Amino acid sequence: EGGASKNYFSILAELIPDAYKFEGRSSRPAKDAFNAMLNYGYGILYSKVERALIIAGLDPYLGLLHSDNYNKKSFVFDFIEPYRILVDEPVFYIFSRHKFSPDFIEPVHQGVLLSTAGKKFLAPLLLEHFDEIIRYRNKNRKRLDMIQTDAHAFANFLIDKRENYLETSINRKLQNFLNSNFADNGEEEC
């Protein structure tokens, strides 16, 4: 996963105008404006994923791919991966179309954070992008509704309602994880 992520962000860095180049992913604090926007956007997305998991009856603290530590919302970290593109696309748009303004960031010790002006600019763009209607699982849905649909599908999979289980990469990984762990332990599958 780490290698793919590194390649993905190095390609993104090559595609945006030279004025906004960055050296891969960085957080806490971001080392550049692109990462500052991603960090803020992912923060919004984390809350949307956590909400979807709770509504579906899933424990956001359960760790399947990330460590199971009850002080961390590990399942949110697991489940968010295929949906990061919901933030990546609008952030890439901002930089590739020269919509970024220097007043969108403010310096902090060893990095930058999104300023109030940056948050006011990015948040509505993200929410508009989340609300766009797309075709997903043979229905017209808001982009953000993909997360809720997949969370319910995963919960149904766990209670053996497997009809039309989603074929997203995260769900295949989780299914393989569950199958291998239960098979190795000699226990029945959930």
What is each model feature region?
Residues E1-C190:
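Active-site helix-to-loop segments that bind/position phosphate- or nucleotide-bearing substrates
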